[in-house]
Amino acid sequence: MGTVNVVRVVSLHKLSWYEKFYFYSIGKGLWITLKHFIKAAILRRTVTIEYPEKKRKYSTRFRGMHTMKRDEQGRERCTSCFCCMWICPADAIYIEAGEVVPEIQHLHPEDKYAKKFEIDLLRCIFCGMCEEACPKGAIYLDGPGEMATDSREDLILTKERMMQIVGGPIIGERQ
């Protein structure tokens, strides 16, 4: 005996008269368009924000540009533990550690510090895993959300650009 070919018979769905002419679908689409038109033109509830003049209010959970925090004495919190670099799924963080010498001991609480700390915003997916992984609370995604620029070099954040200013507010937790 040989192999038997199995044929599956498919019956076509009979379209009704309104399905054939797509009147129902066209009417449904026009109704949605009419609702948006009434909201925008008659009720004056626009969805668009006039950007340069009006700024959008972001929620407290918004993940903006990366910032690095200082402790209460104004020292850098980052101790080059590499937790943020290892957990980053986009591999956007690069850290070079350095030993703390006595001349800069007042700037760093531990025995090593981040000599070079860079975040490539072109690779970053703003997932917030670096913020969660940091045991010292040094990195936060609470900076501005406006990151438009003309050059690619401006989208590579260095430690100096991310570091919180000395004397600024000390924020230890996301508010």
Swiss-Prot record:
Q: Which domain of life is it from?
A: Bacteria
Q: Supply the enzyme class, top level.
A: translocase
**One cellular component term from this protein's GO annotations in UniProt:** plasma membrane
| Cofactors, names only | [4Fe-4S] cluster
Chief subcellular location equals membrane
The positions annotated for binding [4Fe-4S] cluster 2 are C88, C124, C127, C130
User: In Gene Ontology terms, what is one molecular function of this protein?
Assistant: 4 iron, 4 sulfur cluster binding
Which keywords does this Swiss-Prot/TrEMBL entry list?
4Fe-4S, Cell inner membrane, Cell membrane, Iron, Iron-sulfur, Membrane, Metal-binding, NAD, Quinone, Repeat, Translocase, Ubiquinone
Cite the EC number. 7.1.1.-
Pfam families hit by this protein: Fer4
Keyword Iron: yes or no? yes
Tell me where in this chain the 4Fe-4S ferredoxin-type domain is found.
69-98, 115-144
Any single GO BP term: aerobic respiration
Q: How is the cofactor bound?
A: Binds 2 [4Fe-4S] clusters per subunit.
- For the keyword Methyltransferase, the answer is no
Q: Which reaction does this enzyme catalyse, per its entry?
A: a quinone + NADH + 5 H(+)(in) = a quinol + NAD(+) + 4 H(+)(out)
Q: Where in the cell is it found?
A: Cell inner membrane
List ligand-binding residues for [4Fe-4S] cluster 1. C78, C81, C84, C134
Bilayer topology term? Peripheral membrane protein
Q: Which NCBIfam families match?
A: NuoI
Q: What does this protein do?
A: NDH-1 shuttles electrons from NADH, via FMN and iron-sulfur (Fe-S) centers, to quinones in the respiratory chain. The immediate electron acceptor for the enzyme in this species is believed to be ubiquinone. Couples the redox reaction to proton translocation (for every two electrons transferred, four hydrogen ions are translocated across the cytoplasmic membrane), and thus conserves the redox energy in a proton gradient.
Q: Which PANTHER family would you find in this protein's record?
A: NADH DEHYDROGENASE [UBIQUINONE] IRON-SULFUR PROTEIN 8, MITOCHONDRIAL, NADH DEHYDROGENASE UBIQUINONE IRON-SULFUR PROTEIN 8, MITOCHONDRIAL
Family statement? Belongs to the complex I 23 kDa subunit family.
The subunit field of the Swiss-Prot or TrEMBL record says: NDH-1 is composed of 14 different subunits. Subunits NuoA, H, J, K, L, M, N constitute the membrane sector of the complex.
The protein in question is named NADH-quinone oxidoreductase subunit I
This chain is encoded by the gene named: nuoI
